[in-house]
Amino acid sequence: KLLEGRAGVLVDGSPIALTLPYMLIEDFQSSQDYFVTPYRATVSRILRMTAVIAALFLPALYVAAQLFKLQLLPFGLLMTVSGGIQDLSLSPGLEMFFLLAVLEILIEASIRMPKYVALALSVIGALVLGDTAVKAGLVSSPAIIIVALSGISAYTVPDLTGTLSVVRIALLLAAGSIGTYGVVLLTALILYYLVTAD
């Protein structure tokens, strides 16, 4: 990055080097991208960007479609989703918020635990909690799939996981309150902030 005309900041005793100016697109780049062909690196970066967009918008759009615009879904998917959401005790917004909170708790617990316990805790915790919650009628199977895809997609860019979690919850609240209009409005505000930030 220094060869691209940027400045570097090194602090004595810290293993981290900062380069200035910082651009958001840097988070989608990996050091492995420089050791493969340009086509492979481009495909990897596009895949990371797509995964981040999915991590942000999947829960919010699922809730917005379920609450306000269920007819947007294709007929086959509509039948599957409507069969999975019958007799649920939670509203779609609360259901998704509950599942995202459980996902964050599982991630935090697996980070704090020793390595040999963390894997078992995360796998068994996710399987047991997910299966029990579906059988108890608290959550639906499509919601668990959406949250799992969103959680996995967020870790394609590990440096952004904290930010993605906060923005994902904000988009979920906007979708639960005014539907797709809320998602579009909040997305426009986020893009405005990113463009005007120094």
Where are these regions (language model features)?
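Alpha-helical transmembrane segments of multipass membrane proteins
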Residues: 60, 101, 105-108, 127-132, ...
